[in-house]
Amino acid sequence: MIFTAFILDYWYFTLLFLIAAYFIGKHVYTNYLMRKHHAEPILDVVDDGAFGFKFGFQSLKAKKIGNQIDLLFLKFNEAKHPSIGTFVTRSFGMQFIATKDPENIKAMLATQFNEYTLGQRLNFLAPLLGKGIFTLDGNGWKHSRAMLRPQFSRDQIGHVKMLEPHFQLLKKHIIKNKGTFFDIQELFFRFTVDSATEFLFGESVSSLKDESIGYDQEEIDFAGRKDFAEAFNKSQVYLSTRTLLQLLYWLVNSADFKRCNKIVHKFSDYYIKKALTATPEELEKHSSYIFLYELAKQTRDPIVLRDQSLNILLAGRDTTAGLLSFAVFELGRNPEVWSKLRQEIGHKFGLDSYSRVEDISFELLKLCEYLKAVLNETLRLYPSVPRNARFAAKNTTLPHGGGPDGMSPILVRKGQTVMYSVYALQRDEKYYGKDANEFRPERWFEPEVRKLGWAFLPFNGGPRICLGQQFALTEASYVLARLIQSFETLELSPEAAYPPAKLSHLTMCLFDGTPVRFE
């Protein structure tokens, strides 16, 4: 009775005692875990300001002006020991570890793969993408990967001839703008959604066909086709913000977000219904390869088909469009690189009126070494997924970041977020020299690049390495080769800012587009 009265009369002392006990207990338990896992305290702690809300709002502000990716890049340089490449900070109250250390990334993606998960990613992305290969963990992910892997064999990704009709439409748009500066990034996104929907569904949305190049708008036979690309884009903006807000993701669930998701789902459901109405015998007899029809041989569940198709569509459209946009941006400001590419492509496939389009194949494109170097250098400076995250499935460690020299293991508590920046890693002078921020394809012919290992990760690594990497590289190689065959010069607008602002949703592209001129 007296004890209860004391607590009620001096509740503030009780509260202070409980708070102190909590932090002391947490400190003692953390030290115990560090001893158990042979870990050291993390060397760098970056000031987050007001429980990370300062950094969180900085990120939201930077996102609006195309500087969000560079903000994290600068945080690495502002750390007390920038060469360590690992620090701890907060965002919107959540503590997380940020790293660009190749060994730490290798641990999460490969050697300690089972100790790290995607965490809340399914909750962030499910309204649009559902349960697909990019949102699932564990057995669900294993099943998805086993189901999708056969769809990306060389026979499927090597059919470059299907790209030519789409390139001809792209070329008409370029010719229409010939001699003037225009944004080709917007056209690349239309090109890749056209080619991706043909690969996935057997029928292109033909977004490049419009009145500006002499086409009447195609009559649509179901609602949502015209609005699909716009809705898909807007949904990704919402998903990106949900991801940025982490535990507060549920705040982003507006009526417009739901409307966009409904349009995208209705679009994909149209094709899924067509695939499911076909008998297994009809699916086998289909003359050309269609991703959805092959998938329908393995499952007749319409939700599974929709979710996996949209996951692949996201990767197939956005990564390739971003890669092409950044490549053309750099080629436009580096005419000597464009000239070298013309020499290689001319030697292999001819140029201008002497172009041998029929000779371009998956196998021969892989032999174009300078073209490969240009794409590698583009992916190095502008990785499609510039940053990513993993969450500790249990109390575990990362190899580097602790101790007086930053080379000792650090503790990662169960549920803790680890964000890794491929963008920062691939611009690190430690691995790429003093000119790490410069576009120089020739570096890929130097012996040092053979030693890069996990310092070059444009398509992730480990068991979750991107299934579609050859698909993206083949498509980008084909489009660049055909542009080089078709146009003699490429110039970037003198008004284009450098370095360019970057728009990062789930993947990265140019914030202000790619203003170029072809002749």
Curated annotation (Swiss-Prot):
Q: What is its EC number?
A: 1.14.14.-
Q: Which GO terms describe its molecular function?
A: heme binding; iron ion binding; oxidoreductase activity, acting on paired donors, with incorporation or reduction of molecular oxygen, reduced flavin or flavoprotein as one donor, and incorporation of one atom of oxygen
- Return the broad EC class: oxidoreductase
State where the protein is found. Membrane
State the superkingdom: Eukaryota
Known function:
Together with an NADPH cytochrome P450 the enzyme system catalyzes the terminal hydroxylation as the first step in the assimilation of alkanes and fatty acids.
**Entries under PROSITE patterns matching the protein:** CYTOCHROME_P450 (PS00086)
- What are the entry keywords? Heme, Iron, Membrane, Metal-binding, Monooxygenase, Oxidoreductase
- Protein name per Swiss-Prot or TrEMBL: Cytochrome P450 52A10
- Give the chief site where it resides: membrane
**GO (cellular component) term, any one:** membrane
Co-factor requirement: heme
**Which of this chain's residues are annotated to bind heme?**
C466
**Is Membrane there in the keyword field?**
yes
Among PANTHER family, the record links this protein to: P450, PUTATIVE (EUROFUNG)-RELATED
The recorded induction information for this protein reads: By N-alkanes.
State a single Pfam family of this protein.
Answer: p450
